C-alpha cells in the first residue's frame, strides 16, 4: 500500500489537525475521495419484502452521506434468488431492480457521498424459508449454525452464478453507483469456495488454493471485461475455524486479486461459526483486527480497507498513519451517529453519540429492523427529524422522575419540541441501570452512553435536579420503572450491580442466574477478590443478550478467578457460600406485571412510565418507547395546580 500524502495543517478543516491522515485524499480506482471517512456495509432489513429499495433505506444511507461520510458501502445486495440471506435483503438480480437501485444511487449522490454497492450470494449461510428453495454451496456441507443441508453446485451452475455477479455489477453501475464490492468474506458463497473448511470439491473449483480462488477470480475477470469501474473485494483475513483460511492463504488471495485488476481490498474476519469475531461487544479492544489488514496492506499496492470496532477518530487516524489500512471502516459507529465525520471535522468529538457495541443493531438484523439505543432516529431518519422539528402546540411543564438512557432521551426530545422539562433524581448516580453497569469490569463504556444522553438533554435546555418535584412544578409527570424479573429475592444480582449489597472481601459467593445481569454480577464480585461461581440451569449464560457477551464473560469470569457452571439441575455451593440470586431463566416473551420495580413511586402518581432495563435490547426498546412518548401531544392534566 502506498504511503499517505498528508495535507499541511493550514489546509485542513477546523478540528482536523489531530488526525491529518484521516483527512488526507485518496484515489480508489476511478474515485477521488477527499478523506478516509467510510461507512461499512451492514444489513438493515430496510428493503421491501420483495427486495426492493425503499425510501426508508434511501433516507438512512443518505443521512450518513450528509453527516460527512465521503464513501458509503451499501449492505449486501443479492445477485440471484438462491442467494437471499435475509427476509428483506436488497436484490440486484434482475433488470426490474434498476429503477429502485437508481433511486438509492441518486440519494447517495445528493447526500454528497460516493457509493459502492456490495453484491453477494449467501451460499449455505441462510435458510430455505428466505430463498424459497434449497440452499446451494460449493459442497453439500451444512453451516453448523443454520444446520440446513445445501446442494452442491454443478459446474454449469457455477458459470451461471459468475454471470449473475457480473450482471449485478452492471446493474449497479447503470443505476449510478460509483463502484461495486464483491462480498467474498464471512462464509457466504464466494468465501465458501475460497475456504477448504467449506469447499471439499475435487474438480477445478476445489482442492488447491488456486482452484478454490477460481470462482472469485472468474467473477472479477467477467466484471473487468465489461467495465473499469471501481471494484473492491471483501475477504476474511482469518476465518477463526479449524481448517479455515488464515492470514497466509488470505494474503495469497489478495495478491491474486491485485493481479486481476481490483481497485481495493476490504479486510474483515470470520465466518458465521466465528461470528463474535466480526461483531465484537463492549469490552473488546478497539481496532482489534487492523493489524491483520496491515499485514495484507504490506503485500499489495491497492488501497486496503480495515475493520475491527473502529469508533473513535484516534483509532482510525492511527490505522492510516501506521499503514494498517488506507480506509478505516466505521460500522456500528455510523449507525449511532450519522454525523460522526462532520463532528470530528468541526472539532466537536465530545458531541459524538457513542457506539458501545451493545450489538442491538446486529441482533435485530434478521428480525424486524436495525435500531440503536443512543439514536432513536435510525430507520426513520426523515420522519424523526421532521417530528423533532415540529413544535409542541401546547408546551407543558414536564417532570421526569429518574434518570436512565430512556428518560434522558425523552427529556431531550420533549425539550427540543418546546416543553419545559425537568428531570428529578434522588439516587446517588445518574443513569439508572446503565449507570450501574459502568462498575462492571470491561463495561465502563456504558457510562459514555449516559454522559452523551445527559449532554444532549442539557443542550436542549433540560434541567436535572437532585430532589423530588414540589407541588405545582409539573403539569405532567413521567416516571422511570425498571425491568427487574421477579423471584430474584434479596440480595440479588441487581443489588450487587447497583452497589447496595457490599460483601467483605474474600468470600465464597454463589451467583444463581442465567441472564446478562447475573453474569456481570458474578464478574464484578470475582474482580474484587471473591471466590465466585456462576450457576445456571440453562445450557449457557447470557442467553438474553447478544452471543458476544456470552463469549466475553465466559472468558473474563475465569480470568478473574471465578467459575461458570451451566445446566445445573439444583444450585449447590460450599456450606459457607453467600448466595446472590438472579433470574433462573433468560428473560424473554411476555413480561409479567411483577417484573417491574417502581423506585420513584414516592414522587407521586405518574401520567406515564418510562422503561429502564439492564439487557441492551430491552434497554433499547425502552428508549424507542420513550421517544414516542415525547413525540406525542400530551393534553394538560393540571398536575400540581
Where are these regions (language model features)?
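Flavin-dependent oxidoreductase catalytic cores
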Residues: 1-399, 405, 410-420, 429
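Hydrophobic beta-strand scaffold positions of dinucleotide-using enzymes
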Residues: 39, 265, 477-478, 584
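Short, structured coil segments at secondary-structure junctions
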Residues: 300, 323-324, 460, 528, ...
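Short loop/edge segments at beta-strand edges and connector loops
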Residues: 308, 428, 465-468, 564-569, ...
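Extracellular/periplasmic ectodomains of large secreted or surface enzymes and adhesion receptors
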Residues: 354, 365-403, 450-460, 476-504, ...
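Flexible, Lys/Arg-rich cytosolic regulatory linkers and terminal tails that connect or flank
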Residues: 356-377, 560, 616-641
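Rossmann-like dinucleotide/flavin-binding elements
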Residues: 392-422, 465-472, 482-544, 573-581, ...
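Rossmann-like dinucleotide-binding cores of NAD(P)H-dependent redox enzymes
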Residues: 420-460, 516-517, 522-567, 614-616, ...
Amino acid at each position: 500500500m502506498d504511503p499517505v500524502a498528508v495535507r499541511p495543517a493550514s489546509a485542513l478543516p477546523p478540528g482536523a489537525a489531530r488526525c491529518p491522515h484521516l483527512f488526507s485524499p485518496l484515489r480508489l480506482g476511478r474515485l477521488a475521495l477527499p478523506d478516509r471517512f467510510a461507512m461499512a456495509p451492514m444489513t438493515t432489513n430496510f428493503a421491501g419484502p420483495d427486495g426492493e429499495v425503499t425510501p426508508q433505506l434511501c433516507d438512512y444511507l443518505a443521512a450518513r452521506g450528509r453527516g460527512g461520510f465521503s464513501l458509503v458501502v451499501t449492505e449486501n445486495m443479492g445477485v440471484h434468488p438462491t442467494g437471499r440471506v435475509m427476509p428483506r435483503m436488497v436484490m440486484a438480480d434482475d433488470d426490474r431492480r434498476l429503477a429502485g437501485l437508481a433511486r438509492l444511487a441518486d440519494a447517495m449522490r445528493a447526500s454528497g457521498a460516493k457509493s459502492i454497492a456490495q453484491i453477494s450470494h449467501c451460499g449455505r449461510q441462510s435458510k430455505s424459508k428466505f430463498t424459497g428453495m434449497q440452499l446451494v454451496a460449493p459442497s453439500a456441507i451444512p453451516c453448523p449454525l443454520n444446520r440446513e443441508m445445501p446442494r452442491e453446485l454443478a459446474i454449469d451452475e457455477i458459470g451461471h452464478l459468475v454471470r449473475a455477479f457480473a450482471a449485478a455489477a452492471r446493474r449497479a453501475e447503470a443505476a449510478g453507483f460509483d463502484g461495486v464490492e464483491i462480498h467474498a468474506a464471512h462464509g457466504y458463497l464466494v468465501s465458501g469456495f475460497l475456504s477448504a473448511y467449506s469447499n471439499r470439491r475435487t474438480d477445478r473449483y476445489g482442492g488447491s488454493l488456486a482452484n478454490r480462488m477460481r470462482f472469485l477470480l472468474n467473477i472479477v475477470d467477467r466484471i473487468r471485461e465489461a467495465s473499469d469501474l471501481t471494484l473492491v473485494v471483501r475477504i476474511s483475513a482469518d476465518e477463526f475455524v479449524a481448517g479455515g483460511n488464515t492470514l497466509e492463504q488470505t494474503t495469497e488471495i489478495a495478491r491474486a486479486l491485485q493481479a486481476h485488476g481490483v481497485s481495493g481490498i476490504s479486510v474483515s474476519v470470520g465466518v458465521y461459526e466465528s461470528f463474535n469475531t466480526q461483531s465484537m461487544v463492549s469490552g473488546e479492544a478497539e481496532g482489534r483486527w487492523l493489524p491483520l489488514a496491515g499485514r495484507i496492506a504490506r503485500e499489495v499496492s491497492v488501497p486496503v480497507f480495515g475493520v475491527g470496532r473502529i469508533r473513535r477518530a484516534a483509532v482510525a487516524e492511527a490505522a492510516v498513519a501506521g499503514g494498517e489500512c488506507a480506509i478505516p471502516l466505521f460500522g456500528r459507529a455510523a449507525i449511532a451517529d450519522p454525523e460522526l465525520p462532520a463532528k470530528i471535522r468541526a472539532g466537536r468529538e465530545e458531541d459524538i453519540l457513542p457506539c458501545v457495541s451493545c450489538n442491538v443493531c446486529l441482533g435485530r438484523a434478521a428480525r424486524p429492523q436495525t435500531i440503536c439505543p443512543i439514536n432513536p432516529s435510525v430507520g426513520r431518519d426523515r420522519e424523526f427529524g421532521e417530528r423533532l422539528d415540529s413544535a409542541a402546540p401546547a408546551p407543558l411543564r414536564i417532570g421526569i422522575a429518574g434518570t436512565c438512557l430512556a428518560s434522558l432521551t425523552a427529556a431531550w426530545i420533549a425539550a427540543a419540541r418546546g416543553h419545559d422539562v425537568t428531570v428529578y433524581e434522588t439516587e446517588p448516580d445518574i443513569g439508572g441501570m446503565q449507570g450501574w453497569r459502568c462498575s462492571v469490569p470491561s463495561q465502563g463504556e456504558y457510562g459514555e452512553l449516559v454522559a452523551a444522553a445527559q449532554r444532549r438533554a442539557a443542550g436542549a435546555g433540560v434541567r436535572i435536579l437532585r430532589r423530588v418535584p414540589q407541588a405545582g412544578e409539573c403539569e405532567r409527570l413521567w416516571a422511570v420503572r425498571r425491568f427487574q424479573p421477579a423471584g430474584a429475592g434479596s440480595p440479588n444480582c441487581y443489588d450487587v450491580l447497583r452497589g447496595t449489597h457490599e460483601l467483605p472481601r474474600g468470600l465464597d459467593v454463589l451467583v444463581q442466574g442465567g441472564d446478562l445481569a447475573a453474569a456481570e454480577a458474578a464478574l464484578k464480585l470475582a474482580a474484587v477478590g471473591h471466590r465466585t461461581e456462576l450457576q445456571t440451569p440453562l445450557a449457557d449464560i447470557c442467553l438474553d443478550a447478544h452471543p458476544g457477551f456470552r463469549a466475553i464473560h465466559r472468558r473474563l469470569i475465569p480470568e478473574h478467578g471465578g467459575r461458570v457452571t451451566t445446566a445445573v439441575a439444583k444450585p449447590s455451593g460450599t456450606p459457607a457460600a453467600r448466595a446472590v440470586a438472579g433470574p433462573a431463566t433468560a428473560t424473554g416473551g411476555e413480561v409479567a406485571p411483577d417484573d417491574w420495580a417502581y423506585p420513584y413511586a414516592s414522587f407521586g402518581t405518574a401520567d406515564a412510565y418510562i422503561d429502564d432495563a439492564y439487557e441492551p435490547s430491552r434497554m433499547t426498546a425502552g428508549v424507542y418507547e420513550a421517544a414516542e412518548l415525547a413525540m406525542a401531544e400530551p393534553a394538560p392534566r393540571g398536575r400540581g395546580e
